[in-house]
Swiss-Prot record:
Cofactor annotation comment: Binds 1 zinc ion per subunit.
Enzyme class: ligase
Matches recorded under NCBIfam families: alaS
Positions annotated to bind Zn(2+): H564, H568, C676, H680
Function: Catalyzes the attachment of alanine to tRNA(Ala) in a two-step reaction: alanine is first activated by ATP to form Ala-AMP and then transferred to the acceptor end of tRNA(Ala). Also edits incorrectly charged Ser-tRNA(Ala) and Gly-tRNA(Ala) via its editing domain.
EC number(s) reported in the record: 6.1.1.7
Entry-linked PANTHER family: ALANINE--TRNA LIGASE, CYTOPLASMIC, ALANYL-TRNA SYNTHETASE
Protein name per its UniProtKB record: Alanine--tRNA ligase
Organism whose genome encodes this protein: Bartonella bacilliformis (strain ATCC 35685 / KC583 / Herrer 020/F12,63)
Gene that this polypeptide is encoded by: alaS
InterPro entries: aa-tRNA-synth_II/BPL/LPL (IPR045864), Ala-tRNA-lgiase_IIc (IPR002318), Ala-tRNA-ligase_IIc_anticod-bd (IPR018162), Ala-tRNA-synth_IIc_core (IPR018165), Ala-tRNA-synth_IIc_N (IPR018164), Ala-tRNA_ligase (IPR050058), Ala_tRNA_ligase_euk/bac (IPR023033), DHHA1_dom (IPR003156)
Signal peptide: none
Length: 886
């Protein structure tokens, strides 16, 4: 069968047999490419190869590249689920030549694969070429035997590809498949080309020019090839279906969602199942590649995708959390081709659970507000864009969900008004932003780099060196000298000072010359390896070209080394304890402490934290040698070295290995092995001790631990011991019995608090020490009971109102509790026989307004609210009674 997995394998095997290096898909987050939000084409990982900035041992390559188009210029989100071929996630099959073969081989390889390997009928295929590309047209005739009418010349930019305003570019040749005359549409270049009969399945880009400017284009001395074929599209063709969502992969995912929800993918529910299947793929792959849902950047796009799928699950009537239950099905289909999915399965599931749980609350609130704001609208009307923006800005309800919810009613959103509101808010934010205060722009550092070269770093071998001053910067300007008392920056041709990078802070110390002493407070690495020593002249005057001695503060560096090495041990401990889904998301290494951020969907138990700490300290006690090696990156990865997600590494990397893998699991010799450019201890015993002092949440799916090492850890633990002894003295017990004594006191306190609350409720219900409003009154024919009480918890206040409802039988009960800090909490109850005419939510909001609150919520029979002005509790009850008078 031509399954998706078989088609992918056939493509890669075919090009491997034809001399191409089979490479793994690059991550969905482009490495060191700020121009792209997500990888959206196969050629993205080869940009620097095409432009000549990178060289590799191969000159032919083939990939199955995972791609996402859901933000920025390439945004298919709104169409997904409603068309046959729009996806947020897709796979791009490609073959690439880097100054090796060109048009003839590219055309031959494509034609041979389609007609011989995939056995497509020649009669079903036609091609386009750029209108003046006679060479490509001639080669198509020669290789395929296609007639002239099936080699269509296109004069538009659809058949000319450019990387950007400048850079490599060239004509394209697209291959189309004819689905037959039962489907409307004409061939490319015709009036009916927008129909669905003729579908592009493969694009061959012939990079033969370099665009130097808008007016100037020259021939490349060594042209290249970049091709791309959508796996989902070719799968539809080979499986004899016209719709991508009818291929085996999507049929399996949609069948699973139908089984779980119990609703078939027909009629109004057809698009929703397709949205869920597509968005599951993009969500899972983005999480596996290290993206976590958030309110900005890539994380926000992921959250939009996830929530759109969850919104459609809601439309299908899904009572339980859905998305995470589909993850095993997805991994069964795609895990073999993409093992990162398997490794991240638990993380993907937990993040989807967490996000869907949160979103259900947002959805319920947002849909209620949306329905309230759109009740007067009819089919063909426009929904107010300002209101849509308020839903987004205040309640976290994204625009695309508003559009989706209104689409079924035939109502559009005034997107222009939404955009204007968004721009207005951004302008206000910019006006209120004071900036970073950094007076030196990056261009200064690059200018220095061009003039004097990069700084040579000597700090791995020594903490003391000699050098020559190559640049001085004061107040953001390059100067020739700096004088006593002035704060400045010094650049030296070589330095033992480590410049802040990789989470490790910069070194401090002394730079001295014949006539000056400069105290270094910090060292930064700027503009392509220019090391900036930041500090103050303590004596004399420093000049450009002065010979200097540089001495690092070795005691401070020693503490930093211990903390940095500890992060490596903790990283491996976390992975062994929590799972292989743990990936470093950030770190901060200073002389005082270390901080380590990592992917994990939930808080860590005290037992897990103890195990993590114990594992790391076991390696410290080994006192094994820490090994530093320079290796080819492929060899390092093969040996098991962990690389930081999103970092771009050269062909040669620095590898730090720690600890003996005593269990000899697999082929891994070292306990911890990572790519790292930081400074480290010589033996693990130099770390002394590792103690975790906190574990917190940083963002959805990202946790943080903070830890101390060596003397700092010892002093911290001594302080903890001292506090335990002091507390034991206060409690008149021994340190060993402190926990038991505290538990006894807490139990006694809870018992007394319960007795006190019970007494307050009885007093309030019987009209005791509350004011006279505690009596039952009749207002406009309605029985009313209410009062003001002190320091009753909200849950007890509800119980008090329930008791009141039973006591009066029919009517309204309202109690307000005023806490010691002056805040007011109110609960209003309406007996069931009156809920058709009275709404507890409306009544409690009257109280809330008087108390200075923001409204309230609940059901028609019971609602609660609060406010900061508890002193107005009596006034609030009067306002409520006045409302009952009508």
């Amino acid at each position: 069968m031509n399954s998706v997995n078989n088609i992918r394998s056939t493509f890669l095997d075919y090009f491997h047999r034809n001399g191409h290096e089979v490479l793994s898909s690059s991550p969905l987050v482009p490495r060191n490419d700020p121009t792209l939000m997500f990888t959206n084409a196969g050629m993205v990982q080869f940009k620097n190869v095409f432009t000549g900035l990178e060289k590799h041992s191969y000159n032919r390559a083939t990939t199955a590249q995972k791609c996402v188009r859901a933000g920025g210029k390439h945004n298919d989100l709104d169409n997904v689920g409603y068309t046959a071929r729009h996806h947020t996630f897709f796979e791009m099959l490609g073959n690439f030549s880097f100054s090796n073969y060109f048009k003839e081989e590219a055309i031959f390889y494509a034609w041979n694969l389609l007609t011989k390997e995939f056995c497509l009928s020649k009669d079903k295929l036609l091609v386009t070429v750029y209108h003046d590309d006679d060479v490509a047209a001639g080669l198509w005739r020669k290789i395929s035997g296609l007639s002239e009418e099936k080699i269509i010349r296109i004069a538009t930019n659809d058949n000319f590809w450019m990387m950007g305003d400048t850079g490599p570019c060239g004509p394209c040749s697209e291959i189309f498949y004819d689905h037959g005359d039962k489907i409307w549409g004409g061939p490319p270049g015709s009036a009916d080309e927008d129909g669905d009969r003729f579908i592009e399945i493969w694009n061959l880009v012939f990079m033969q020019y370099e665009q130097l400017s808008k007016e100037k284009r020259i021939e490349l001395p060594q042209p290249s090839i970049d091709t791309g074929m959508g796996l989902e599209r070719i799968a539809a063709v080979l499986q004899g279906v016209h719709d991508n969502y009818d291929i085996d992969l999507f049929r399996t995912l949609i069948h699973a969602s139908q089984e779980i929800i119990g609703v078939k993918a027909t009629g109004d529910f057809f698009a929703s199942h397709r949205v869920i299947a597509d968005h599951l793929r993009s969500s899972a792959f983005l999480i596996a590649d290290g993206i976590m849902p958030s309110n900005e950047g890539r994380g926000y796009v992921l959250r939009r995708i996830m929530r759109r799928a969850m919104r459609h699950a809601h439309l299908l009537g899904s009572k339980d959390l859905l998305m995470w239950r589909l993850v095993p099905v997805l991994i069964s289909e795609m895990g073999q081709a993409y093992p990162e999915l398997v490794r991240a399965e638990s993380l993907i599931s937990e993040i989807l659970k967490l996000e869907e749980t949160r979103f259900r609350k947002t959805l319920e609130r947002g849909l209620g507000l949306l329905n309230e704001a759109s009740t007067h609208l009819e089919e063909g009307d426009y929904f107010n864009g300002e209101v849509a923006f308020k839903l987004y800005d205040t309640y976290g309800f994204p625009l695309d969900l508003t559009q989706d919810a209104l689409r079924r009613r035939g109502i559009s959103v005034d997107v222009d008004a939404f955009d204007k509101a968004m721009k207005r808010q951004k302008a206000e934010a910019r006006a209120n932003w004071s900036g970073s205060g950094d007076c030196v722009t990056e261009t200064v550092w690059f200018s220095i780099r061009d003039q004097v070269g990069a700084t040579e770093f000597l700090g791995y071998e020594t903490e003391k060196a000699e050098g020559i001053i190559t640049a001085l910067i004061r107040d953001g300007e390059v100067v020739d000298h700096i004088d006593l008392g002035q704060k400045a920056m010094i650049v030296v041709n070589q330095t033992p000072f480590y410049g802040e990078s990789g989470g490790q802070v910069g070194d401090s110390g002394i730079i001295s010359g014949a006539n000056f002493i400069f105290e270094v407070h910090d060292t930064q690495k700027k503009g392509d390896n220019v090391f900036i020593h930041i500090g103050e002249i303590k004596t004399g005057q420093a000049k450009k070209h002065d010979c200097v001695e540089l001495i690092v503060d070795s005691a401070r560096r020693r503490k930093i080394r211990a903390n940095h090495s500890a992060t490596h041990l903790l990283h491996e401990s976390l992975r062994q304890t929590l799972g292989s889904h743990v990936v470093q998301k950030g770190s901060f290494v200073s002389p005082d402490r270390l901080r380590f951020d990592f992917s994990h969907p939930k808080s860590i138990s005290s037992e897990e934290l103890k195990k993590i700490e114990d594992l790391a300290n076991d390696i410290v006690l080994q006192n094994s040698k820490v090994t530093t090696r320079l290796m080819a990156i492929d060899d390092a990865i093969a040996e098991g070295a962990m690389a930081l997600f999103g970092e771009k590494y050269g062909d040669e990397v620095r590898v730090i290995s720690m600890g003996n893998n005593l269990e000899q699991t697999g082929s891994k010799k070292w306990w911890s092995i990572e790519l790292c450019g930081g400074t480290h201890v010589q033996r693990t015993g130099d770390i002394g001790l590792i103690h975790i002092i906190s574990e917190t949440s940083v963002a959805a799916g990202v946790r943080r631990i903070e830890a101390l090492t060596a003397t700092a850890a010892r002093l911290y633990l001594h302080g903890q011991d001292r506090r335990v002894y002091e507390i034991a003295g206060l409690l008149k017990t021994s340190p060993a019995d402190v926990q038991e004594r505290v538990q006894t006191l807490l139990d006694e306190r809870r018992k007394l608090e319960k007795e006190l609350n019970d007494s307050r409720k009885k007093i309030a219900l019987n009209g005791g020490s509350v004011n006279s409003q505690g009596d039952i009154q009749t207002i406009n024919g309605i029985s009313f009971m209410g009062g003001v009480v002190s320091n009753i918890l909200p849950k007890d206040l509800k119980a008090l109102v329930d008791s009141g409802k039973k006591k009066i039988g029919s009517g309204v009960v309202a109690f307000i509790s005023v806490s010691e800090d002056g805040k007011g909490s109110a609960v209003v109850g309406v007996t069931d026989d009156l809920t058709d005419t009275l709404n507890a939510v409306d009544l409690v909001r009257i109280i809330s307004v008087t108390l200075g609150g923001q409204g309230g919520g609940g059901r028609r029979d019971m609602a609660q609210a609060g406010g900061s002005e508890g002193g107005k509790a009596d006034e609030a009850l009067v306002a409520l009674k006045d409302s009952l008078k009508g």
